[in-house]
Amino acid sequence: MNTLTLALRGLTRNHRRSIVTLLAIAFGFAAISLFAGYTHNIYSGLARQSIHGELLGHLTLSKRGMSTAGKLDPQRYLLTLDEVARIEAALQHEPQITLIAPRLAFSGLVTNGRASTIFIAEGISPQAMDRLQENMLTEQEARSGMYDRLAKKLDPARESGVALSAGLVELLHLHVGGEAILLVNTLSGQANAMDVTVDGSFNTGNAGTNDKFAFVPLALAQSLLDAEGRADRLTLLLEDVTQTEAIRDRLLAKLSAAGFDLEIATWQELSSFYRQVHGMFNMIFGFIFSIVLAVVLMSVANSVGMTVIERTREIGTLRAIGLKRSGVIRLFATETLLLTLLGCGVGFLLTVGVRYGINGSHIAYTPPNGANAVPLLVDMDYPRILLTMVLMLAVGMLAAFLPSFRSARQHIIDALGHV
Amino acid sequence: MSLSHPRVSVPTQRPASTLLQLREVGRRFMLGETPIDALHAIRFDIHAGEFLAVWGPSGSGKSTLMNLIGLIDAPTTGEIYFDGHCTGDLSDDELTAFRGKNIGFIFQGFNLMPVLSALENVMLPLHIRGVGGREARTRATAALQDVGLAKFIHSRPDKLSGGQRQRVAIARALVVEPRLVIADEPTANLDSHNSLMIIDMMREMNRARGVTFVFTTHDPRLLAHVDRKVLLQDGCIERDESTP
């Protein structure tokens, strides 16, 4: 028999109270873990959507000032064919970089011959587009079929083939295989128009852009803008998303040493939507976390407080037969630790069960500003589950400390005389 | 409790070594703003191997005296010496360790842990002292055998009779091989048959092992079994008699 056994037996003394406290911990733990799992799924989904769905890649490399002054004077900040080639050469031995894709963004009018509307387009090579969209969906998401229209495709064999967002196709009564005309200003300010074929349509996933976005082959974009061989930025795809920041810093130093005055933005910096959603969910998570921890704190404090009162004579007896004050605190701390651990264990099982139920029930919802429904999925966010457990243990110990400290300080004869 | 009561202290003359010395020990409690003197300048020695009963009417200060002798309470005035060492100099942790090693307790209400078996209850003081599991189990089993409860080692207290529970408590008190056992009204919750059995058992342990026993009682019949009886009245020793 040791302190652990004694603590375990102590928990069985008033098993109803122990079970109620355990369930409070378990439900709190499960609530936090499930919400953490849900937000994890949202974060990873948004990250994949930003990197692969919106074709941001992991890093975007452009001339310094392109994102500010370059908006008004793009010609001055575009990368030349020679610069693109030199940068690609400088980066070709970077093992973490799996793709370097020159891009050229532009806007203009698109018409079906009877009506016109504005569009925003990205010029990119069809091969790079395919590479960037790899790993966009998880197996589960792909199976759900809800994301089928998110894929963007350009035919590398067709120089004038474009992909238009679904809203744009609908707005202009176009159809896949049909013709449209793109009208833009060249870099020098001349009007330029070109017939294109609608090779495909896609859903941007965002109601704000789904009626104006287009992808065109890079060569077509360069031809439209009269910007032969030029690009406004290079999109880099990395092997490991967690290395994004570190590689950005390394590349910046390397390219700067090679004489380039460039800026490199991470996908997180470019995706304000991701940052906003991340910030909002973190705030909600913190709020829920605080409430649950407060409930756990009060439950454990109440439970230990009642236990201490109930077992005052027992504490007196233990003290009389040689248990030191620290031993009394250790005993109740061990009981609380066990109760909290068991609560977290039951909470974990609840999390697994409820998650299985949610993920298997194919619940779908349309997120704010979303263009289509998405499945409600919950991940297992193990780092935050572990953090929740550690914090719950800490809170439990904190809640147990004061009543057990008081009981340990009590005079033995008062404790023995307690009725 | 009268403050003017005459204080009588009768030191006993015995060949055995002195285990415990109380020197002008007083104990005052505060009842709100009112001070209550439970013991008045007690001067009193306990010798190793004695089987001693403290008796007297309710409120005479018996339990207070036992608490002081058992070192679970501290005197307001005076000093208590255990084996010649002043216990007032010890810190709480030192005193607790000292108690765990030298003093066994038998309580009126048995004070057994209800969630532990008889064996585990007896192992408890050994566990507190850091004795290993196997050795603690062996010693606790032997202690329970000594009090005739070999068949009940796995029984929880609620499955035992009052007499059996008190025997478990005796085993728990003796398992650490203490030098002194304090028993505050050990027979108060028992019938006369069990009371005599418990006293006989304590007496036997006293004779066989030389452990010093000090207990309080209301029951005058039990006084016939002791070799020294101290009458306490109004916080003072009224009479200290040795039985030949």
Where are these regions (language model features)?
Chain B
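ABC-family P-loop ATPase nucleotide-binding domain
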Residues: M1-R28, R239-P244
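ABC family nucleotide-binding domain
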Residues: L19-H225, K229-L232
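H-loop (His-switch) and adjacent beta-strand-loop-beta switch element
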Residues: K229-E241
